[in-house]
Amino acid sequence: MKPLNSWIVCGTAIWLSTAYPGGAQPSPSLELSLFAGVNITGTTGSIYTVQSTSDPIETNSWKSVAFVQLPTTNYLFVDTSVPARGNRFFRALLQQPPTNMVFIPPATFTMGSPTNELHRWANESPQTRVTLSHGFWIGKYEVTQGEYEDVTGTNPSVFPGNPSRPISSVSWPDATNYCYVLTQRELAAGRIPAGSQYRLPTEAEWEYVARAGTSTRFSYGDDPDYASLTNYAWHFMNGALTAHPVGQKLPNPWGLYDIHGNVWEWCQDWLGDLPGGTVIDPQGPPSNAIGWKVIRGGGYDFSEGDCRSARRYFFGNHPALNDSNLGFRVVLSCP
């Protein structure tokens, strides 16, 4: 990633930095400012990683604070996560899209289902207005057996023989360990920005990307008789009781495959009631007395209604607890 015409901000001062041929840089100029952030000039729709440091001379001190998609050619990013301090510097780096991932900008949406939704469950209430305040990347596909084995050296799936099938029979600790090992490997190789990490999606993030801007039962519509679901999902009626290679069905409007069906997907959250009202970046409850973690999306051996965007289900968080219909997809985010 290369810095492109980025403003570096130090508390109440701005340091203007520009990329020059051959890496030569003139002495920085300082101007007064009352914010902590960076002014980014680039192509509308392009994605940047915003980083900060207290020591701009130390190369390894820069840490990512946000992914930003430019709404205009000249965009001012202001970091409101912590109060401005005099020793904070910022820069913006053009982000190359990670392989097979989709960028999701910040947004607000309604989580849960209305009381009149067909085949809904009671735990989908109350509907909750959720704001996701930070952009993130999410995998187009469920993590495959080939990807999992490449990172961990193991393949616990009971459906081996095709590396394009989703990994399954993985516990929640297995899934989070995969994210940790992948993060360390990609950071060491310089393929992801410093300070970023792979992780499981939160339940709110998962439902938001599954809906892809819709409020219907599925990302493609309500489909009350499930006539179109077979075009998008593997489930009990067409799945032949086995997991299928990823990407064989149609994607949702944001380009995510198998978000309905194939295998259930682990989320980061402990299971809890939806809070109702308006919330920002919900993480779920701090614990669950029984040890349930949230899973989403439905699976090849579950009913059509279980593939709905709002369907909430759960499974135990224990290294020995897994199932042949349970896998995951990953998010790349700034902590």
Residue ranges of model-derived segments:
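Surface-exposed recognition segments
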Residues: 117-130, 214, 222-224, 239-242, ...
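Acidic glycine-/aspartate-rich tracts in secreted/extracellular proteins
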Residues: 44-46, 53-58, 95, 114-115, ...
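A short glycine-rich, aromatic-capped structural motif
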Residues: 97-157, 170-173, 260-261, 330
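Short strand-edge motifs at loop-to-beta-strand transitions and within beta-strands
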Residues: 75-77, 165, 244
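Short, flexible loop/turn segments at beta-strand junctions in immunoglobulin-like
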Residues: 80-83, 169, 248
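Short, composition-biased motifs enriched in small/polar/acidic residues
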Residues: 5-7, 11, 15-100
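Short, well-ordered surface patches within globular domains
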Residues: 109, 162-229, 266, 272
